[in-house]
Amino acid sequence: MSGGREIALLGGSFNPPHVAHLMAAWWALATQGVSEVWLLPTFRHPFGKDLAPFEDRLEMCRLAARALRGVHVCGAEAELAADPLVGKTARTLEHLAAKHPDQRFALIVGADILAETAKWYRWDRVQALARIIVVGRQGHPPVPGAPDLPAISSTEIRARLARGEDVRGLVPEKVLRYVEEKGLYRG
């Protein structure tokens, strides 16, 4: 990769996207010298978890991204749907580097995820293709210079939605409306 702008990728299942995702994106834009943050929903979860349909998660990311200037959505993993390595960060980064040769990439990961990189496919390749930006997570060792994100979990949000509980304040309002209109995560 050459000079160009640096784009930070915030990958995840976004099942659904929540305000801590937006906080991480804003923090990266404000403090890490990146020109943009791309929300990058996984097409298929690398560890086999069930997800809402990709198209719904992509649209929820678009709705969430509208809240912050400089945050966009990248559906690159859909382009790799037939690839047996879809969902593997190294493969996605290789794809993006080939598609955008004038861009530099960074990868935003939570401290909780950083502890699991031994399970990742070709973590060494991920580090070669992208600068790693670590955000703190409550309940994990502090990350120097990074705030701890609130302990908001998509899993807990889905459970609350399934029980008919209120999740306002945890999920962007437009995302919540979409979830309700589509009947996602009902019990």
Swiss-Prot record:
Give the Gene3D superfamilies listed for this entry. Answer: HUPs
Keyword terms of this UniProt record:
ATP-binding, NAD, Nucleotide-binding, Nucleotidyltransferase, Pyridine nucleotide biosynthesis, Transferase
Q: What is its EC number?
A: 2.7.7.18
- InterPro entries under this entry? Cyt_trans-like (IPR004821), NadD/NMNAT (IPR005248), Rossmann-like_a/b/a_fold (IPR014729)
Gene Ontology MF annotations: ATP binding; nicotinate-nucleotide adenylyltransferase activity
One GO biological process this protein is involved in is: NAD biosynthetic process
- List the pathway annotation: Cofactor biosynthesis; NAD(+) biosynthesis; deamido-NAD(+) from nicotinate D-ribonucleotide: step 1/1
> Per the record, what are the reactions this protein catalyses?
nicotinate beta-D-ribonucleotide + ATP + H(+) = deamido-NAD(+) + diphosphate
Top enzyme class, one word, equals transferase
Q: What Pfam families is this protein classified in?
A: CTP_transf_like (PF01467)
Q: Which family does it belong to?
A: Belongs to the NadD family.
Q: What does this protein do?
A: Catalyzes the reversible adenylation of nicotinate mononucleotide (NaMN) to nicotinic acid adenine dinucleotide (NaAD).
- Name used for this protein in its record: Probable nicotinate-nucleotide adenylyltransferase
What gene name does this entry carry?
Answer: nadD
